[in-house]
């Protein structure tokens, strides 16, 4: 449930590095445990994703499924990391002992357009735990964040609280 701008960034960076970009379609809203939005929401989402990617890995005769986990992610409570372990997903950035700062510096050295891109989080993370995740709510959050992006803000989140939106903007 990432904003569409993330897909645009992925497509652009794939072109920059000469990688084939393939989109794997998922439907988290079809997963009842995900929609309930409990403390294991990320686990349910990632389990579904890694199951799909494992099938793609096998059909492409690839050796591994990898993710973008880095050293800075390891201290956080991340149910998605548990799913990654269960599915045998490799984390090459962790294996290389790279932090977010290291990754940004390397991306800048390589001339990648996303080297200074703010961290992105799933739109579902903007909905308080226990509140059901719906397509309508996700669209509302994405639309509100798109307005902030068009206005030139870079580091922000819009959190959905029913009929109220809480806008968090970093000092820039």
Q: Which residue stretches match the model-derived regions?
A:
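ATP-dependent adenylation/nucleotidyltransferase module used to activate substrates
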Residues: 1-109, 150, 165
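Mid-to-C-terminal catalytic subdomains of enzymes
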Residues: 97-148, 152-162
């Amino acid at each position: 449930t990432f904003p569409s701008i993330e897909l645009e960034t992925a497509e652009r960076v794939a072109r920059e590095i000469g990688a084939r970009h393939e989109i794997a379609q998922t439907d988290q809203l079809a997963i009842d445990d995900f929609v309930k939005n409990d403390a294991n929401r990320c686990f349910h989402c990632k389990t579904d994703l890694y199951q799909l990617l494992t099938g793609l890995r096998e059909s492409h005769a690839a050796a591994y499924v990898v993710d973008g986990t880095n050293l800075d992610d390891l201290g956080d409570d991340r149910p998605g990391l548990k799913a990654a372990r269960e599915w045998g997903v490799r984390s090459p950035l962790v294996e290389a002992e790279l932090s977010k700062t290291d990754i940004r510096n390397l991306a800048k050295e390589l001339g990648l357009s996303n080297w200074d891109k703010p961290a992105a989080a799933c739109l579902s993370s903007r909905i308080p735990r226990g509140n059901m995740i719906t397509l309508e709510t996700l669209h509302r959050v994405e639309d509100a964040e798109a307005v902030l992006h068009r206005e030139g803000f870079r580091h922000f989140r819009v959190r959905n609280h029913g009929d109220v939106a809480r806008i968090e903007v970093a000092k820039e």
